[in-house]
């Protein structure tokens, strides 16, 4: 930075310039104080007079001083002409930003809600507004409206305990009571007494039968006659009835013609199969109780 060299003939000009600068600075401070009094939006900024700072990068002569003086007078005159006269008016934002007092006015001008498909078919250029919809289940959608049906195998359809209208659905017992047994095809005692005409006349035996073949087989028990021998090599067994021989012969061959429909087990005797089926009936009752408990827990 070079130091300013001012000739002695220009001292009077600099005294006048300093006086005008002080007057100009005082006038600006007074103007900003009045503006701060009428508008409290911001604090008054400090006044900086750029004309008080003289930076020269070279020697100073009379021509530079005259140019600076003329520029200073021009700036001061322009600033004084632009100063507004009279008290300053405060800012009023009411006419620039009208207030919406009624929120329903905006809602009344909104278009009625439309589905995305209806909005697309209407050909409107405006984007479809987002609508947050809450899913409310229907009161009719209760547990009772759900059906628990499924296809069953032939073993369930053949069960005579299930009514015809309920076949093809899952069987749930209506109560904890055991299902009533279907009466067997065996005849009652009165009917059998009328049909039993074949009586055994051995002393001390009063058995009667509906068929003569049954009476003949029974009489062989008293006489000890066994006309049906086993023909398997090395076997000397003899039987009084042919069905007993057939049953015995299966022990040699290993044949099991009586198969269970519920599982894969097979038996050589029909009475053994009947005993096995009773176990399945007990298991079905237990399963029915478990299904009933699960259903009651679900609802």
UniProtKB/Swiss-Prot annotation:
Record-stated family: Belongs to the krueppel C2H2-type zinc-finger protein family.
PANTHER family (UniProt xref): KRUEPPEL-LIKE TRANSCRIPTION FACTOR, KRUPPEL-LIKE FACTOR 2
The keyword Metal-binding is assigned to this record: yes
Biological process according to GO: regulation of gene expression; regulation of lipid metabolic process; regulation of transcription by RNA polymerase II
Top-level taxon of the source organism: Eukaryota
Single GO cellular component term: nucleus
Free-text tissue specificity from the UniProt record: Expressed predominantly in intestine.
Coiled coil: none
Zn finger limits (C2H2-type): 198-222, 228-252, 258-280
Biased composition (Basic residues): 23-38
Protein name: Kruppel-like factor 2
Subcellular location: Nucleus
One of the record's GO molecular function terms: RNA polymerase II cis-regulatory region sequence-specific DNA binding
Organism lineage string: Eukaryota, Metazoa, Ecdysozoa, Nematoda, Chromadorea
Function description: Probable transcription factor which regulates lipid metabolism.
Residue numbers spanned by region Disordered: 19-38, 146-189
Primary site of residence: nucleus
Biased composition (Basic and acidic residues): 153-180
Observed effect of gene inactivation: Lipid contents in the intestine increase by 44%, but increase is less in response to high levels of dietary calcium.
SUPFAM superfamilies given in the database record: beta-beta-alpha zinc fingers
Entry keyword set: DNA-binding, Metal-binding, Nucleus, Repeat, Transcription, Transcription regulation, Zinc, Zinc-finger
Reported induction: Expression is repressed in response to high levels of dietary calcium.
């Amino acid at each position: 930075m070079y130091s300013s060299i001012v000739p002695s003939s220009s001292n009077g000009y600099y005294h006048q310039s300093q006086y005008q600068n002080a007057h100009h600075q005082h006038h600006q401070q007074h103007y900003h104080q009045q503006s701060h009094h009428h508008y409290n939006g911001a604090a008054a900024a400090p006044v900086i007079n750029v004309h008080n700072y003289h930076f020269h990068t070279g020697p100073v002569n009379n021509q530079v001083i005259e140019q600076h003086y003329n520029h200073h007078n021009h700036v001061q005159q322009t600033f004084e002409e632009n100063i507004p006269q009279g008290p300053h008016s405060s800012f009023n934002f009411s006419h620039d930003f009208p207030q919406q007092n009624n929120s329903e006015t905006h809602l009344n001008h909104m278009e009625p809600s439309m589905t995305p498909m209806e909005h697309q078919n209407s050909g409107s250029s405006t984007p479809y507004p987002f609508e947050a919809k809450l899913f409310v289940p229907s009161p009719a959608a209760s547990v009772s409206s759900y059906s628990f049906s499924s296809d069953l195998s032939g073993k369930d359809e053949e069960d005579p305990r299930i009514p015809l209208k309920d076949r093809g659905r899952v069987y749930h017992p209506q109560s904890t009571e055991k299902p009533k047994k279907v009466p067997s095809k065996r005849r009652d005692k009165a009917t059998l007494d009328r049909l039993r005409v074949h009586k055994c006349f051995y002393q001390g035996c009063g058995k009667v039968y509906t068929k003569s073949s049954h009476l003949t087989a029974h009489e062989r028990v008293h006489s000890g006659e066994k006309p049906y021998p086993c023909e398997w090599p090395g076997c000397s067994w003899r039987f009084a009835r042919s069905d007993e021989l057939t049953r015995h012969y299966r022990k040699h061959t290993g044949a099991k013609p009586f198969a269970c429909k519920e599982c894969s087990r097979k038996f050589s005797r029909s009475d053994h199969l009947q005993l096995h089926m009773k176990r399945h009936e007990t298991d079905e009752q237990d399963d029915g109780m478990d299904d009933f408990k699960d259903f009651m827990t679900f609802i």
